[in-house]
Amino acid sequence: MIHQYKNNGFHIVMDVNSGAIHIVDEVVYDMLPLYQEHSLEEIKTLLQDRYTADEIGEAAGEIEELKNAGVLFTEDIYENYLMDFKKRPTVVKALCLHIAHDCNLACKYCFAEEGEYHGRRELMSYETGRQALDFLIANSGNRRNLEVDFFGGEPLMNWQVVKDLVAYGREQEKLHDKKFRFTLTTNGVLLDDEVMEFANREMSNVVLSIDGRKEIHDRMRPSRNGKGSYDLIVPKFQKLAESRKQTNYYVRGTFTRNNLDFSEDVLHLADLGFQQISVEPVVAAPDEPYASRMEDVPAICEEYDKLAAEMVTVSYTHLGYKIEKQS
């Protein structure tokens, strides 16, 4: 199985089963949909109005080279193992701990309703968190590496319990031959030097919530009194990113119908010095004014194309792609 598409003047072919990605010329690109169902002579006839027989013959040689190298039209070698894989004993490998059902921001698109999840505002107790870690260990089977994300609401509103649970997890590692990877997700309002020092020592990853340009961020992520949070959090996020040597963190933004030009927000975050960036579409009920609509899809695709075109000049990580800044 192959998947073909064009982007920024490139003819791109992905071999689905091997994961190989090829940049090919136009002749090869046009031949590939015909290649497995037609003979070479039939292809020459079908494409004779566009290419010469020699061009098609040369392209066929290139296709055969890729096939013989095992990177084009490859078989799915895992298909026969799929059912056995599904029958394997299941284990729990990760937890997202809602350590705080409360928040100090009032983000307009928040599915947690200012952190309370349509319930009452409260903070997770140490005892509940401890039992959650015990559950994870007890149900992790032979898996050694376990993951826990401190989430909310805003986790820093329950910071002491976060620290206590990390300490408990470290104790349990030794007893059960496990290794915890802790992650902290924060809006940055309560971020300070003490939190940074602890996070740099204990958190394998830190997720920093920011939507991009000041006017975009402040519109969607105000504090409870209606004031924007951009100016408060940006210097802290920059300091944390540098203190982690621009690794093992990422700034996480959400784009809505209010900023369908979200490539500008990605580039803005890169200009602020962030090298690990993820900006994702909002998840919202269709009747929300900021919700993306089907008619917005072409504009959204165009923004991704713009970001792809910036690959050689901007450094950011998005959907698994790390793009290095060129000197």
Regions flagged by a language model, labelled:
Residues 1-35:
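Acidic, low-complexity/disordered tracts enriched in E/D and polar residues
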Residues 38-49:
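Short acidic, hydrophobic short linear motifs in intrinsically disordered regions
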Residues 50-51, 57-197, 202:
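Conserved alpha-helical substructure of the radical SAM core
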Residues 95, 148, 182-184, 206-208, ...:
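Hydrophobic faces of well-ordered beta-strands that scaffold small-molecule active sites
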Residues 115-116, 155-157, 188-193, 205-227, ...:
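Conserved radical SAM core fold
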Residues 131-134, 160, 164-171, 194-197, ...:
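Alpha-helical scaffolding segments of alpha/beta enzyme cores, especially the outer helices
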Residues 201-206, 273-275:
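Glycine-enriched alpha-helix->loop->beta-strand junction motifs that scaffold or abut catalytic
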Residues 219-231, 238, 242-327:
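Radical SAM enzyme [4Fe-4S]-AdoMet core and its adjacent flexible, acidic
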